């Protein structure tokens, strides 16, 4: 039993290979791990944590983004949320911010929609890593 399952969290894991091609010629290939969790109790947070990119910077001109006050986090992670107060409270913890930044910085995405959490992590992960466990533990308190 995994550490997350021991906390009462339902875990689904899948693996995908993403390829890019130009004019029918494969130019790159990368593997990703897709995780889906159902938390043991309902939470109200709705947020997506993704890589800060040019498009996100344009969106920030028109819509305020949560800033954690941690320059490394704020420059790496774009936070989209419908629950800004709850999301800001989650980001008060330095270890949670650091874990999110590492996962997203490596090419991952985290989506939280109430008791449902979806992560896509770069690479092949057969077990939960410390950053995933820290993040989910922070969600359930």
PLM region descriptions:
Residues 2-141:
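Charged, low-complexity intrinsically disordered regions
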């Amino acid at each position: 039993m995994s550490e997350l399952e021991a906390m009462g969290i339902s875990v689904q894991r899948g693996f995908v290979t993403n390829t890019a091609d130009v004019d029918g010629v494969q130019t790159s290939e990368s593997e990703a791990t897709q995780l889906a969790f159902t938390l043991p109790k309902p939470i109200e947070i709705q947020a997506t944590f993704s890589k800060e990119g040019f498009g996100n910077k344009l969106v920030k001109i028109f819509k305020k983004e949560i800033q954690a006050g941690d320059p490394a986090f704020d420059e790496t992670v774009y936070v989209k949320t419908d629950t800004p107060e709850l999301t800001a409270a989650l980001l008060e913890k330095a270890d949670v911010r650091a874990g999110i930044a590492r996962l997203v910085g490596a090419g991952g995405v985290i989506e939280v929609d109430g008791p449902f959490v979806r992560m896509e992590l770069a690479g092949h992960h057969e077990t939960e890593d410390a950053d995933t466990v820290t993040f989910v533990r922070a969600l359930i308190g």
